[in-house]
Amino acid sequence: MNDKGVYQEKYTKANFITRRLIDGFFKATGELIAGLDVRTAVEFGCGEGVSTRRISRLLPTGAVFEASDFDERLVQAAQALNPNIRCAKESLYELHRADNSFDLVVVLEVLEHLENPDRALREICRVARKWVILSVPREPVWRLMNLARLKYVTSLGNTPGHVRHWSSRTFRRFVGLYGVVREWRTPLPWTIVLLDVGE
């Protein structure tokens, strides 16, 4: 889960086009959350907490929301940015949570950084009571957009730290091994999936 900072730069150093893309990303995420019966929720891999703040505004009023990351420095930054949200340090490979702890688990822009996403997804689904929202860069669109702006050319547009790559179809197939894909969105240049693990 290294290089989370590359993702956070999209928030902190974003130009107009990037901001529009990010707004579209969270609009699509909000569409997946809307209508869900969510009383407890958590974001794993929260980074510096910018996404945490955006997600908190999408949840139903009164929902209890927590966040965590594996990096203590990022946890402290997330807590400072979100003083009313409990932020903890933990690894996606070994979550300090009981089974079926949350109505909704949100994991955004994390799985592509993991050497063992299957292991992480088993843990994510273990602690989710019903719903999981997952997002990853949509390949090959992600790399092509990087190359179009002459970023990471020597690595053929691959963002540093991205060790897993999925198209929208292959990602839905992958997460479908752990639950039922109820809905998905493809805001440029991501794939976002709503997974039902309560069946």
Locate the predicted segments by residue.
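Conserved N-terminal segment of class I S-adenosyl-L-methionine
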Residues: M1-A98, D118-L121, A148-L150, T154-E199
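A conserved beta-strand element that flanks and buttresses the S-adenosyl-L-methionine
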Residues: V106
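Hydrophobic adenine-recognition pocket in adenosine-nucleotide-binding enzymes
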Residues: V110
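A short helix->loop->beta-strand "cap" motif at the edges of active sites that frequently abuts
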Residues: G62-A63, A128-K130
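Short "lid" loop at the C-terminus of a central beta-strand within the Rossmann-like core
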Residues: R138-W142
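Histidine-centered divalent metal-coordination motifs
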Residues: H113
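Conserved beta-strand signature within the Rossmann-like core of class I S-adenosyl-L-methionine
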Residues: R129-P137
